[in-house]
């Protein structure tokens, strides 16, 4: 479904769907960086929710709910993420006083992380907006998820990391063909990513960008 706008999760300021990729410009100007979220028209959202909730689970992934995700069908990038199982944990529940405790097994996702969900939606959005390269700043699961989805989409991926980058994560990202660049500090990662966004038109997938 096409959102009507993006809105700051802190101050409520709204902006256009093409950005901002650096979060809310109002909060940023006040020295308090804040993310933004998509906003739908209620007249379209409520019927879409009814359609999704009333039909059988036709797709065994998160795109079963595509009508209420901010990406058009022809832009979807997926590796089958989502629809992970719930497992009953009665003994653990009894110990902590929760009689009907269930655990969501997100390790069943393509890169063994719940972050595959965000990465799939973000890379799909990059495709829909016509961006040619995705970029992030991660040394962990988020970077691996973005790398996998970018590879699936056939899009180059640049990931800024630190010098203390774990070998296991480096290997996982490298398998997907990601360009890995180590920065001296965490802050340097974000500065370099910002340069790629501003100067080269890269699409950022990072906790400091649009959510």
Please provide the spans of the model-predicted regions.
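PLP-dependent amino-acid enzyme catalytic core
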Residues: 1-211
